[in-house]
Amino acid sequence: MKVLIIRPQPGADATARRFAAAGYAPVLMPLFAIEHLPPPSVSVDGYDAIVLTSGNAARAARGFLESARDIPIYAVGSATASALAHLSLPVAATGSSGVEALVGVAAEDGHTKLLWLAGEDHSAVPQIAGVHIDIAIVYRSAALETPAQFAAQVTICDAVILHSSRAAVHFAHLCDAGGLSRSKIALATFSNAIAASAGDG
């Protein structure tokens, strides 16, 4: 079974390895590229913990994080924790249920002023009593020029993997622009919200 992976690198390769290990035949066609933004202008001295929800954030803010080694880092997901480990940065805790649950863990550890390093397209900032969260945008996912083989790759694959709502919206737009029938395209998404973003079809 062929699955089309459209997420940006290096995440696309990591996703492809997981699907290949599960017996699928991954086809890579990234429709986005990660762009690192300037490091946060805030001082880490005002925070008692840092939250990351993406390996992209870890890579984009490497210098900033290296200057903040005394501050515990909380990571959402094993991929984020792995990216931090690859950069030789310690992880205080790794969560698997999203940023709100992880903020709750940090709060239980006594941290009440958190800095969330995130991408431009991020979920809502959690609202937890007694916890103040500032967010710093350290990267963005920029749409690439539509590949010439877009329609052909979509047609030959059995399913398209969508990792984010933005990717779902962009993919649906490209399908419509290319005259592809949505009803003939199977989608595999990481949440109901992402599926809804892809629209009807």
Put a short name on every predicted segment.
Residues 1-201:
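Signature of uroporphyrinogen-III synthase
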